[in-house]
A protein has these predicted regions:
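N-terminal positively charged helical leader segments and presequences
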Residues: 1-79
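Glycine-biased, small-residue-rich flexible motifs in mid-sequence functional cores and linkers
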Residues: 54-359
Length: 359
């Protein structure tokens, strides 16, 4: 309605029962009457006073603090946002990432959400979520634990702690970060409002990470909305047998990017140079051998004794070079001597350094 006629025009025609359908094409009488009842109950001065008492404010399009990326929603852009907290909404949104997921998450999901939240916060990112039970709450707590920046986007008023069990958490977020809502103070959540809330999370952030989600999940709604808006979409994989990871895996089969830690998220959505560290396994004693010693070790079979001459032929080195390397390998515990022959040390070192394979 606002997109069709503008906020001022809407307020002009709503109070008059004989008007509205003509000025607002496509509006049914029943729907228009519903909007009239809601408009009659509105008290802007009361709402502004209520949010001010919480140390908050109303941020509108065109304000200095308005996040311009919300304009990507087009006609679905929020008319305004109620904000509670001291931080600047626009500046925080410029470097923000959403972490969302299942309410009834597993311990694994809660651990991953908290770890991601903490890791992203330590890298200077603002973690945005919905303050729900499960993954949302774990992500917020992970950020708060390291003194980072987090924002909760609610499907109710900024003064309504929902869910009730997260009243303390939402209060901590308001003190350390931001609590954001489309509904005015006192507004209560409904099923439809959660869906509307999800689009704000998707548009506000540079990317969305999904940690555990079933096939029919509000988190996937957020991810798909983010995808349509050209934002990055990521997912944390889980067990193939877990129904709570089925939706994430479906996302990863499409356009989603698999991530397992904060550095991978930052590499995808961050600036040039925000690279995740190279993955390497543990450095084993075998890795420290020089190339010739490694060749001699590779030439030793799993079982039985082998002469120095046979090993030299297998390694492609001289007999003297081979013998010198065998003594080196013996001092390191890789091989043992028996008469004129050499064999791999048994049992193998517990670190798995001895060569695997052989003839």
């Amino acid at each position: 309605m606002v997109a069709a006629g503008g906020a001022v025009e809407l307020l002009r025609v709503l109070p008059h029962r004989g008007r509205g359908r003509r000025e607002l094409p496509g509006m049914t009488a029943v729907r228009l009457e519903g909007y009239r009842l809601r408009a009659a109950a509105a008290d802007p001065a009361r709402d502004l006073a209520a949010v001010a008492a919480l140390g908050g404010r109303l941020v509108c399009p065109g304000d200095r603090e308005w996040p311009s990326q919300l304009d990507d929603l087009g006609d679905a852009r929020p008319v305004a946002l109620w904000v509670r907290g001291r931080a600047d909404l626009r500046l925080w949104a410029l470097r923000s990432v959403a972490v969302v997921g299942a309410r009834a998450c597993t311990p694994y999901g809660a651990h991953m959400a908290a770890t991601l939240g903490a890791g992203l916060a330590e890298r200077g990112w603002v973690v945005v979520s919905g303050a729900a039970f499960g993954v949302d709450g774990a992500a917020h707590r992970g950020v708060l634990a390291v003194g980072g920046a987090t924002a909760a986007v609610l499907a109710c008023g900024v003064d309504v702690p929902y869910p009730r069990g997260h009243a303390e958490l939402i209060g901590r977020v308001a003190q350390q970060g931001l609590v954001i809502a489309e509904l005015p103070p006192g507004g209560h959540p409904t099923r439809a409002r959660f869906v509307l809330r999800n689009r704000v999370i998707a548009a506000l952030t540079r990317g969305t990470v999904v940690v555990e989600a079933e096939y029919r999940s509000g988190s996937l709604v957020t991810a798909r909305q983010a995808q349509r808006l050209g934002r990055f979409v990521m997912g944390v994989p889980g067990p193939a047998t877990s129904g709570l990871s089925a939706g994430v895996h479906e996302l990863l089969r499409g356009e989603g990017v698999l991530v397992t830690e904060a550095s991978e998220v930052a590499e995808l959505i961050g600036e040039i140079g925000d690279l995740a560290p190279d993955r390497r396994g543990p450095v084993l004693p075998r890795d420290r051998l020089d190339p010739i010693a490694a060749k001699v070790l590779d030439a030793l079979p799993y079982h039985g004794l082998t002469s120095t001459r046979e090993l030299a032929r297998g390694a492609g080195t001289s007999a003297d070079e081979t013998l010198g390397r065998l003594y080196e390998l013996h001092s390191l515990g890789f091989v043992e001597r028996e008469g004129d022959g050499w064999r791999l040390t048994r049992p193998s070192p517990r670190d798995g350094a001895v060569r695997r394979g052989g003839s």
